[in-house]
From Swiss-Prot:
Its main location: membrane. One of its GO terms (molecular function) is enterobactin transmembrane transporter activity. GO terms for cellular component: plasma membrane. Residues 1-21, 77-83, 131-156, 200-218, 278-287, 337-356, 400-416 are cytoplasmic. This is Enterobactin exporter EntS. Gene3D superfamilies: MFS general substrate transporter like domains. It is found in: Cell inner membrane. It comes from Escherichia coli O127:H6 (strain E2348/69 / EPEC). The gene is entS.
Amino acid sequence: MNKQSWLLNLSLLKTHPAFRAVFLARFISIVSLGLLGVAVPVQIQIMTHSTWQVGLSVTLTGGAMFVGLMVGGVLADRYERKKVILLARGTCGIGFIGLCLNALLPEPSLLAIYLLGLWDGFFASLGVTALLAATPALVGRENLMQAGAITMLTVRLGSVISPMIGGLLLATGGVAWNYGLAAAGTFITLLPLLSLPALPPPPQPREHPLKSLLAGFRFLLASPLVGGIALLGGLLTMASAVRVLYPALADNWQMSAAQIGFLYAAIPLGAAIGALTSGKLAHSVRPGLLMLLSTLGAFLAIGLFGLMPMWILGVVCLALFGWLSAVSSLLQYTMLQTQTPEAMLGRINGLWTAQNVTGDAIGAALLGGLGAMMTPVASASASGFGLLIIGVLLLLVLVELRRFRQTPPQVTASDS
């Protein structure tokens, strides 16, 4: 059979027990983090009535994640990766307990929320980097595209479920329940991760960590193909920072606390559909052009989002953004793995993830600032259409990425 299915092949979960353990742990972790992601902005909005303060919390956490990714890349290449993953997860859980205790105080501390956001952002990113570095050893380099799509599906499905649960918890029990369940879920993820095999770092000459990072930066800047992919990823992540406007837009649409969860769930739902129907993406002849066009469509969806007269139509726009961004992100991931030398894969993956975090932090800060000067509707639309203009310029400038062609892999009877 030579016809490739549109649907994602989930066979890796059956054939690779270690990857199955990571799948389970990641799903539980994403559900836990989703509860946190709903609670923090809503709590800050209630305490301060300021979109700028909400944006600041996201920016601070994003900055801590950037530093953590840089440090984590070095640790993952020097120390046993399973230990790094377990240490990072356990430390994050401690931070979530701190948020829960703070929320139970008669007057919760805004400073404590910011500081614990820095703590959790830093240590969470250590685990992310170690998992990225360990994935080829867990599934094999030939299965990276499939593993990436399954991972995205895991993340997105968890992100669909958790905001809805988080919204219901906010409406019934308050933010302390969100933080407490997030902490419990994070510690539960340690159980499947304990079953992972030892994941030693690859043998390589010892060099100063900064020198190693600089080599990765130089490669990224010198390669118009890989550098263009990283730039698109950062801009796409900037667009997703529109979530800092959700609480204010919810007031504009007169949404209930439970309905706010649908805003947070829309993008992950669209992305889950994109990952589930990604079976043919690896066989695209012109992945660079498809990546550029899907990114432009995602920016347009964000521009239209804030203009919708009803919140349900806004949810549809967010879901469309999620689907298009999933297509672009999967193509980014696959092309980075195939176009980056093996010796550079760890650093480039870390830098790619770090610039995505940076894009999110910058986007959150810009949207928070716009929200202080403009209406939430105008802020959302300005960000989407502004990124669309930049995207059109990149479509013209990134010639090598736009014209890149690949030979689709052959599909044999054993693959079907």
